[in-house]
Amino acid sequence: MSRRVLVDSIAYLTKEYKVDGFHFDMMGDHDAESIEKAYLAASALNPNLIMLGEGWVTYAGDENSPVQPADQSWMKNTDTVAVFSDDIRNILKSGYPNEGTPAFITGGKRDINKVFDNIKAQPTNFEADSPGDVIQYIAAHDNLTLFDIIAQSIKKDPIKSENNAVIHRRLRLENLMVLTAQGTSFIHSGQEYARTKQIRDPAYRYPVSEDKVPNKAHLLVDEKGNPFDYPYFIHDSYDFSDAINHFDCTKATDTKSFPENTKTRAFAKGLIALRKTTDAFNFKSKADVDARVTLLTVPGTNNVTQEDLVLRY
């Protein structure tokens, strides 16, 4: 019955409301056959439809009736639905539960070959038989925004212009790596201009007593351990007001007041345009990727070590 509800609902939304994409939160809780049937029903109505989900290994069905879950392990057997790659997320900027730990973009040396494998849509923690199986992302609706996690990781208060510039340069590099990676690139809404979920209410400009700490907030500190000016940043904002969840269009468009934000947005826009003009970042098969995407900074040559902070491909 649950499969019938799932398939019929997806087909109805596709037919009646012309929905052309579906993102399953916790898709690994479902069985693969149900998700596949939902995709086939919807794609019969719209062949250009996209379906993706969180393929974390979370299935908890009847152990006496084993099935293939709709998780990352399914990707070697399907080319219809894609999953998010936590591997590229963790290796480039760190992720739950280790947010704030320095990663490749924030000063933490990483295995160059593993970084490159992820750029090729060949994650090291699950097998994908084609690039289209892999959603290449750094940030999404969960956890801190990319801007905020960079600030946390490098311990630089963005209220200082020189720190803000450093954070933006690292964010632009993250966007560059995601938007030139094989597979399907995904950016969090607002990531293109460096969206933040910092609380800028005067009541929270300085640390408050424990009983007044905002729900689902991280207190960020600089390299000396001093709290940021307005130190609270929300990491789970689905039930917060527009004060946290709004899109600050002024930051995205006002070049005079927000030169770094508008520069970051223009950079992302250019990368998206570049990606659309060529198939060089969107090869269809693993064989094509292996034949045509080459690592130039090979560990052991030109002073590049196995774990390093340099990558050229």
Where do the protein language model's features map onto the residues?
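Aromatic- and acidic-residue-enriched carbohydrate-binding clefts of CAZyme catalytic domains
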Residues: 1-4, 8-16, 240, 244-246
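Aromatic/hydrophobic pocket-lining residues that form the small-molecule binding cavity
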Residues: 2-6, 35, 171, 264
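Loop/helix patches that line or flank the sugar-binding groove of alpha-linked glycan CAZymes
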Residues: 131-313
